[in-house]
């Protein structure tokens, strides 16, 4: 019985430790961390907590993306509209500084190639669209978007530099701002200090139909 009690208490300790150990070392290798530009703000320095400690709220997500765009020559940001609840729908364009300076020409070339007015060339950067968290109850996308955007903005790794030289990434950190905000509020106000996987827990039983 004593051994069972010990194992029970140890499991809570390990779960609690796992929640607290959410620094950049948890998400990135030491080599990745070494390559990061210290002039680019990390998510934690802006949102006030490590990524994963709390579900990101949409207002903090937007605040961080705007901070990245202000701090990095690789990123521009635009507001494309508003949601039903008047939250901004934002889109980041992430690419190399050189491509940013020629972004209008790159866009024109892609349109002309699509319309058959220009022969496709291998040196033309690819355009990739990445969107996160279409459903409010699928928050991992928008939470991971914090880390991915930071890495693309801050990394001086050779692979990342080559990627951004050859690619223009259209980056939508939240398809569904209203759903993300609703779920983040519910989960953050009802979660336990220690992780609880019991499906009967209040954290997992929202007052609206799940998913959206």
Which role does the model predict for each range below?
Residues 80-81, 92-95, 131-134, 172-176:
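Active-site-proximal beta-strand/loop segments in catalytic clefts of secreted hydrolases
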Residues 34-53, 130:
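Acidic/histidine-rich, surface-exposed loop or edge segments in extracytoplasmic proteins
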Residues 107, 117-131, 139-212:
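Active-site/substrate-binding loop(s) of hydrolase catalytic cores
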Residues 91-123:
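Carboxylate-rich, divalent-cation-coordinating active-site regions
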Residues 74-81, 158-163:
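Surface-exposed patches in mature extracellular/periplasmic domains of secreted proteins
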Residues 1-23:
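Bacterial Sec-dependent N-terminal signal peptides
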Residues 57, 86, 133, 171:
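Divalent metal-coordination and catalytic microenvironments
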Residues 21-30, 61-69, 76-79, 85-87, ...:
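Soluble secreted/lumenal catalytic domains
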